[in-house]
Amino acid sequence: VTWLNLLGSDVMGISLNPIKGDNHFKILKKNLNIIDKRGDIRNVNFLKKNIIDFKPDIVFHLAAQAIVSTSYKFPKKTFETNVLGTLNLLSVLSELKHKCIAIFITSDKCYKNIEVSRGYKETDELGGDDFYSSSKASAELVFHSFYKSFIKDKNKFLRVATARAGNVVGGGDWSKNRLIPDCAKSWSKDETVVLRSPNSTRPWQHVLEALSGYLHLAYQLNNKKELNGESFNFSNN
């Protein structure tokens, strides 16, 4: 938000209420210049009212159920949030009558795991063995179908792209089952770190690297029509 403010933007954010206890928004909200709207992305009428009223020039869609373990407990809610939420936002944005750039953040987990040593390419097959990964793959398919059906050569106002983000690390992540925050919490209490998948190797990027990439993608999408409807990896995986 601060980055966008420094660039001269008026910012509106739509989100569920923050998690109880420590959370990034609670700590920073006094210093944020933002119109704060509370609601569920699954509620298309709520989305439509706030977006139509605000008339955004640029939209970054980061709302998601983003925890793999939670997706096993609540698969229906995970799909509703990640897939239906994407469809709802696309539907609302397609009704705008002014130019709008929209970046949909999905995940590099959207690819079918084919156990290769190279990094995945945007043209690789989508898939997912767990509910979180498959919901993100499904969101990509919904995005692609909506673009082909209702935006490409049909909507002169809306340009869209997806950003497939990899693992990020940075301040303010209090979600459960986060490797780096869990290490910091355990070490601060002189406790042993519990690793859920000790045989896995995970690449990381700082959260500001990913965010700067999203800003750059929005800028390029605004200037280059040929990027409309494309997907881009933001990961070192």
Give the positions of each predicted feature.
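N-terminal Rossmann-like NAD(P)+-binding domain of SDR-like oxidoreductases, especially those catalyzing
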Residues: 1-165, 169
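Glycine-rich Rossmann NAD(P)(H)-binding loop
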Residues: 73, 165-172, 194-205, 223, ...
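A general structural signal marking secondary-structure boundaries and capping sites
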Residues: 70, 93, 97, 150, ...
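C-terminal structured domain segments across diverse proteins
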Residues: 122-124, 135-136, 160, 181, ...
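Alpha-helical substrate-binding/gating segment
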Residues: 181-193, 204-232
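The catalytic Tyr-centered alpha-helix of NAD(P)H-dependent dehydrogenases
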Residues: 117, 128-135, 176-180, 203-207
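Conserved strand-to-helix beginnings and helix N-cap segments that scaffold or border functional pockets
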Residues: 48, 72, 173-177, 207-208
